[in-house]
């Protein structure tokens, strides 16, 4: 529906991103509540929802709010009710959609899985979302050679590919690489995906490198070796790192390991978040020769 109120557009974005209902932002201001439950809003929602386990929880929450404020004068939209009934038995898990301006990126992931088969790459982490926002606000150039380390679900790589860059997405886990390939196909993106073990496999020539949440205790020295190799191959390469400061000591230990390179913290922009996530403080660093 065209001309929808801004808060309904945000509801749609959160629904497609499958934001947890306990932190779902239904309205932007108190005066939006009556609009959220009128006939227009119900038709708007009926056009975006599809039967799934997430939709079941989403509509259950919506109907609960509706029952709490409605005195029974408004009829429930039949299409919404039908979708809810279908969702009761649905086991379908749709891809998550991350919307960054004109770029809609579909990602198949396990949003509530922290670790699967020894890897954290089964879901998109907050630092990865923040890095995607950073790239959207500081676009890569068409034709630029982009390397992503620890690609995870591939959100950052796919965004860069949609911007016209030549992308190599890498990860140290074979199954994670398979997941990136699947997500690239889902978005009709031509992305080269390769398994890369830090400190072991030689990296390829790149104009710019992106990595999010890659500073772990056991991998710090190997990561530092790979970053040094990248700069050696192309001294003009820039490396952009994002990290959630869950353990600041670990990140600062990493910075000590790359003292042979130039690392500077990037200033946090004042723009509001585009995607929906909660996170510890996230820092950005640019590493260069």
Swiss-Prot record:
Its EC number is 2.1.1.-. S-adenosyl-L-methionine binds at residues 125, 150-152, 171, 198, 212. One of its GO terms (cellular component) is cytoplasm. GO terms for biological process: cytoplasmic translational elongation; methylation. It is found in: Cytoplasm. Signal peptide: none annotated. Keywords: Cytoplasm, Methyltransferase, S-adenosyl-L-methionine, Transferase. Its main location: cytoplasm. GO terms for molecular function: protein-lysine N-methyltransferase activity. This is Protein-lysine N-methyltransferase efm3.
């Amino acid at each position: 529906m065209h001309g929808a109120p801004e808060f309904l557009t945000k509801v749609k974005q959160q629904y497609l991103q499958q934001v947890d209902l306990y932190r779902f932002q239904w309205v932007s201001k108190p005066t939006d509540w009556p609009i959220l439950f009128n006939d227009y809003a119900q038709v708007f929602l009926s056009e975006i929802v599809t039967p799934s386990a997430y939709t079941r929880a989403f509509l259950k929450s919506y109907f609960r709010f509706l029952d709490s404020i409605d005195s029974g004068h408004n009829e429930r939209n039949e299409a919404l009710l039908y979708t809810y009934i279908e969702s009761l038995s649905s086991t379908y898990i749709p891809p998550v959609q991350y919307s960054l301006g004109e770029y809609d990126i579909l990602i198949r992931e396990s949003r509530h899985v922290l670790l699967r088969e020894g890897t954290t790459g089964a879901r998109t982490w907050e630092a990865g979302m923040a890095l995607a926002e950073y790239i959207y606000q500081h676009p890569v150039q068409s034709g630029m050679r982009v390397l992503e380390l620890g690609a995870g679900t591939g959100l950052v790589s796919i965004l860069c590919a949609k911007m016209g860059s030549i992308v190599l997405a890498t990860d140290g886990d074979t199954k994670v690489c398979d997941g990136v390939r699947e997500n690239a196909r889902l978005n009709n993106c031509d992305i080269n995906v390769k398994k890369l073990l830090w400190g072991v496999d030689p990296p390829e020539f790149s104009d710019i490198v992106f990595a999010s949440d890659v500073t772990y205790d056991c991998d710090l020295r190997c990561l530092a070796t790979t970053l040094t190799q990248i700069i050696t191959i192309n001294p003009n390469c820039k490396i952009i790192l994002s990290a959630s400061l869950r353990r600041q000591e670990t990140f600062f230990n990493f910075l000590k390991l790359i003292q042979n390179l130039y690392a500077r913290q990037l200033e946090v922009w004042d723009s509001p978040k585009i995607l929906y996530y909660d996170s510890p403080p996230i820092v950005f660093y640019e590493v260069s020769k």
